[in-house]
């Protein structure tokens, strides 16, 4: 396909899909029933607030209908597993499961799932705290499972203590996930997946969520675990205003590892205004990075995100053997600080392709990003990294010494600023920027060198400490000092190549046509 970079249009379409796709009006009764549950209740009672039910077992016997609401008494613990099977409500009268009185009710499911929705529609789970027995102390399941459902809302949920994912959305569509705190789980905080080889998980919106301290699945000895937010075999996904931190540190194996926020075998994903920091991997393990566009990802964008102090690279660009083709993805207006010093990549950006087929790994636009690393390199190419159509424009690359590791092949670098903290410039053993540009025909437009080798006058580099996406708009550490001309020495990507930059910079200010770096 032609690379037209129409991601603003894509974003608007995805929002329409997520909030409106598949909806239909249904005529139902004007009112539903209410059911109350309290530790002081009795399952033989009426289920009213005055005479509440007591146990989850009672809830599982109810045949809920459109408009019904289930209330659990806040700050009380209810033992067991909620299972709702094949119940369909309606757009205007959803079924709601929530808390009443002060605080959130706690569902303690021990070694099993806490809440499972199977083949259901129009159900909302709001203001509930779910806990398992712990990823190493008895639990072997996911926390909340949305299985083959549509039009589901998960809002204001705290989920912890599950060996697999805190929240698992499987083969479902039109799911709104908001304000979920997923922590102290095994495989992942939040996991979204369709069936293998299918994209039958679709129109998922993850907003204002956090995935923290999900260390790894002790039972998974063959693949990665300890992810923050992960999406695969899916399409039309938005992950925004969310955070992943301190995940992956107890993955029980070496080999491919976890990442803070990432997707694989996915089409039309937008990851934006997110923070991924201090994520880890096992000793000797791979990955442990901030963000990742992995095998089989297509038509996807990462924008306005901050990655810092991850053991793995801030941005992984990966294709693995056996995945669908990887193509037409964009990484723009992001910042990586001090990433990749522990994992084998040793760089802020890591590019890898185990398929060794350039036709399977092509067309990436990487522009207006800042990669700052006082410890290791800016970009690393694995010895297996064959690809085509990768273009890097208007970025600022700052590294400890070596700026580039490995061989970039036929990648295009144009309009970037390069700076080595130790040697001013070092790429492929060449210590002179102009000599490197002429040797490899890089950073040239119409035979003229358009790249730069200037120390960027950042405001407060190397000191990121923001932890909330709401703080990103005022994060000025990598905004070039006021009135510095370097900020406007990039290329006009629209005039030259027809690339629309989306109109916004990292900090949501207007992105100038010739802007260099991420913040303005």
Task: Locate predicted features.
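Right-handed parallel beta-helix
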Residues: 94, 98-103, 121-132, 150-161, ...
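Bacterial N-terminal signal peptides that target proteins for export
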Residues: 1-8
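Extracellular beta-strand-rich solenoid/capping regions of secreted or surface-exposed proteins
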Residues: 57, 62-66, 77-96, 105-152, ...
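Surface beta-loop-beta hairpin patches that serve as ligand-binding interfaces in beta-rich domains
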Residues: 430-520
């Amino acid at each position: 396909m032609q690379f037209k970079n129409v991601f603003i249009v894509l974003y608007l379409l995805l929002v329409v899909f997520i909030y409106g796709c598949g909806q239909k009006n249904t005529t139902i009764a004007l009112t539903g029933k209410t059911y109350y549950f309290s530790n002081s209740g009795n399952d033989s009672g009426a289920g009213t607030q005055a005479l509440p039910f007591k146990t989850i077992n009672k809830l599982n016997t109810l045949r809920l209908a459109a408009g019904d609401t289930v209330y659990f008494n806040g700050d009380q613990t209810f033992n067991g597993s909620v299972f709702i099977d094949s119940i369909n409500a309606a757009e205007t009268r959803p079924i709601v499961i929530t808390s009443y009185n002060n605080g959130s009710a706690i569902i303690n499911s021990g070694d099993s799932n806490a809440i499972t929705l199977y083949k259901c529609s129009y159900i909302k789970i709001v203001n509930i705290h779910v806990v398992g027995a712990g990823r190493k102390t008895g639990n072997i399941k996911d926390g909340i499972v949305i299985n083959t459902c549509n039009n589901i809302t998960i809002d204001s949920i705290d989920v912890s203590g599950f060996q697999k994912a805190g929240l698992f959305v499987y083969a479902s569509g039109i799911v709104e996930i908001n304000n979920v705190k997923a922590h102290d789980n095994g495989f992942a905080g939040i996991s979204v997946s369709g069936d293998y080889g299918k994209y039958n998980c679709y129109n998922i919106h993850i907003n204002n969520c956090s995935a923290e301290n999900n260390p790894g699945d002790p039972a998974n000895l063959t693949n990665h675990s300890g992810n923050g937010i992960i999406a695969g075999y899916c399409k039309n996904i938005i992950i925004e205003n969310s955070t992943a931190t301190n995940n992956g540190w107890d993955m029980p194996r070496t080999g491919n590892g976890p990442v803070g926020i990432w997707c694989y075998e996915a089409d039309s994903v937008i990851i934006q205004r997110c923070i991924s920091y201090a994520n880890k991997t096992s000793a000797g393990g791979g990955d442990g990075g901030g963000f990742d566009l992995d095998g089989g990802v297509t038509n996807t964008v990462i924008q306005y995100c901050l990655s810092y102090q991850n053991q793995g690279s801030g941005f992984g660009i990966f294709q693995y053997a056996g995945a669908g083709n990887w193509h037409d993805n964009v990484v723009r207006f992001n910042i990586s600080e001090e990433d990749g010093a522990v994992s084998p990549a040793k760089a802020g950006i890591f590019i890898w392709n185990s398929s060794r087929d350039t036709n399977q790994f092509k067309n990436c636009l990487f522009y207006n990003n800042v990669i700052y690393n006082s410890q290791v390199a800016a970009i690393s190419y694995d010895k297996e990294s064959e690809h085509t159509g990768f273009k890097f424009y208007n970025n600022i690359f700052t590294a400890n010494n070596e700026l580039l590791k490995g061989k970039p092949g036929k990648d295009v670098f144009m309009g970037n600023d390069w700076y080595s903290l130790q040697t001013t410039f070092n790429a492929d053993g060449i210590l002179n920027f102009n000599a490197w540009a002429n040797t490899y025909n890089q950073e040239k437009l119409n035979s003229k060198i358009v790249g730069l080798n200037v120390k960027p006058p950042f405001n407060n580099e190397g000191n990121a400490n923001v932890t909330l996406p709401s703080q990103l708009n005022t994060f000025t550490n990598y905004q070039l000092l006021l009135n510095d001309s370097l900020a406007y020495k990039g290329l006009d990507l629209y005039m030259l190549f027809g690339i629309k930059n989306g109109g916004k910079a990292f900090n949501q200010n207007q992105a100038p046509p010739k802007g260099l770096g991420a913040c303005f």
